Amino acid sequence: MMPRARWLLLLAALVLSLAAAPVRAAAFLVPLGDTRVALDAPPGFADTGFLGSPRLEELAQSLTSASNRILLFAITDGDLRAFMNGDQPAMRRYMIAVTPRSLVRHSVSLDEFATLAADALRGLGKPAGSADYPKFLDRQPAGQASLLAELRSEPEVVSVLQGTRMPSQGGYGEKPHYLLSTTTWLLLRGKALSVSVYTGYDGPADLAWIKYVTQRWIDQLQRINSR
């Protein structure tokens, strides 16, 4: 992720560029080789691709590797309204869907997907040994995403929960700030996608929320791609 100061500058610049933009929220098809994959954001979120904002695209690019193609970057409806009204958005929750550029034109088999997911998991390390995630994250390097738990492991879905202790801003008596994220690898219509959900982590409600929304988004994407 980019430095917080740069992130805030980009957010401030977006206020002016999005102030007059219209709102649109609907499922859409993304051509990947000879296949079209259906995408949509969960209720309460809006895909931002239609805005055509270079600054917003830069924010999305900060969340993923340059080797991935961004298919969707969604923010909350409330944050989108804030942008368009010229107010400061919270940017506390957001989500992204990507696919490896090297696989855009390739039809991925179940065996290939299993290898891809296993390779991705192998680089995440071991999950936290307890459910006291703040305590676990306090022992990890600031700014580094750490594996907290494996959520699903199925032939076409592999999902994990991660957490990050955010770098200190240097304020006196500053409390630690945490970020939760889920990353899910999905096989949809022969295409390998990675979808991630992010939220600030202040307590159990945020943990419950991200697990629920992740599951709901997985189900939604599988449903609209089974037609």
Language-model segments: what does each one mean?
Residues 1-11:
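Bacterial N-terminal signal peptides that target proteins for export
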Residues 9-19:
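Bacterial N-terminal signal peptides
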Residues 21-25:
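Sec/Tat signal peptide C-region and signal peptidase I cleavage site
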Residues 28-40:
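Short aromatic-glycine motifs in intrinsically disordered, low-complexity regions
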Residues 37, 41-49:
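Short conserved aromatic/hydrophobic patches within beta-strands of well-structured domains
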Residues 46-116, 123:
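Secretory pathway targeting signatures of secreted, lumenal, and periplasmic proteins
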Residues 112-184:
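Signature of long, low-cysteine stretches enriched in small and polar/charged residues
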Residues 190-227:
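Surface-exposed amphipathic alpha-helical segments
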